[in-house]
Amino acid sequence: MKEVYLVGYARGASGQSDEPPGSMDHQASVQRLSGEYFSLGNPSDGEALYETAAGENTLSEHTSGEHTSVEHASAEHSSTEHTSGEHASGEHTSGERATGEHTSSEHATSEHTSGEQPSGEQPSGEKSSGEQPSGEKSSGEQPSGEKSLGEQPSGEQSSGEKSSAEQTSGEQAVAEKPSGEHAVAEKPSGEQAVAERPSGEQAVAEKPLGEQAVAERPSGEQASIEKASSEQASAEQASAEQASSEQASGEKPLGEQPSGIPPSSTFSGPILNCHTCSYMNDQGKCLRGEGVCSTQNSQQCMLKKIFEGGKLQFMVQGCENMCPSMNLFSHGTRMQIICCRNQSFCNKI
């Protein structure tokens, strides 16, 4: 403060001031510019410092104006490159564009910081003018940063291509997966071949039909359809064999010959001696084949009456396993069956 006061006093006393002596702005600017950096030895040095500082202040303002225009141009250039960067990143994913915008915002922040640094150093005119080339150098180095920004989409593009390549390989793996599933789907066909083997052992005639059905069907549907068909064929075969076994052990053709073991559902009575006759006239007289049969197990004595043209022709009597009372018709011939339970002779005309 004392030095500034001496400078103002020297200017007022000598009368060599270029500006009005009552101007406080210049004194304040002299206080800001020279208060912290210089120590005045005499009033003449203060006057020279004032003139030099005023000139350098003007130079600094001009320099800061040029620097502002440079920053404005560089900002426009960065916005242009930012647009091109966004256009380049627009061709790629949205995540890459966000990364490019974040990088450009950081770059703009670095420009703002570099722009503020020379203005903060402006109070020392020589130092700001000396540091201005470094600021320009930093602004000149900005295209390298922008170049790295411009190069970033290419790196991102390579990463995008890598991700697309990985996606393609993933799709290829997915495409290959159904083939694996197809192999798995073909496995039940092998199991089904094992499942078809017992049915082939049960019925040899059905096995070529099953193989033909396997050859005609697609490989994808072969597992479930053939398995169901094999199970159905085995179930039908089992039912057919059961029916054939029941038929074999069931009703016999109506003849005179005795049969073997009857089913357990028939009537089981006491053992009787039944009179047999292979041919008996309408009067009940046995003409041939007369004899005696024992009703073992569930056998019964049965009489058959044969009618032709509504007239009784002959009768047959014997021991039979099953004896339902019924009437049978065949080509004008009627046969009446009469069961004689617990009777040795059932010749009842």
Curated annotation (Swiss-Prot):
Pfam families according to UniProt: UPAR_LY6
Subcellular location: Cytoplasmic vesicle, Secretory vesicle, Acrosome
Biased composition range(s): Basic and acidic residues: 63-114, 178-189
Ranges annotated as biased composition (Low complexity): 221-248
InterPro entries for the chain: Acrosomal_SP-10-like, LY6_UPA_recep-like
Region (Disordered): 1-265
A GO cellular component entry from the record: acrosomal vesicle
Main location: cytoplasm
Signal sequence, start to end: 1-8
Tissue: Testis.
Residues carrying a glycan: N342
Compositional bias annotation for Polar residues: 117-142, 154-171
Record keywords: Cytoplasmic vesicle, Glycoprotein, Repeat, Signal
Disulfide bonds: none
Family affiliation: To acrosomal proteins SP-10.
Protein name: Sperm acrosomal protein FSA-ACR.1
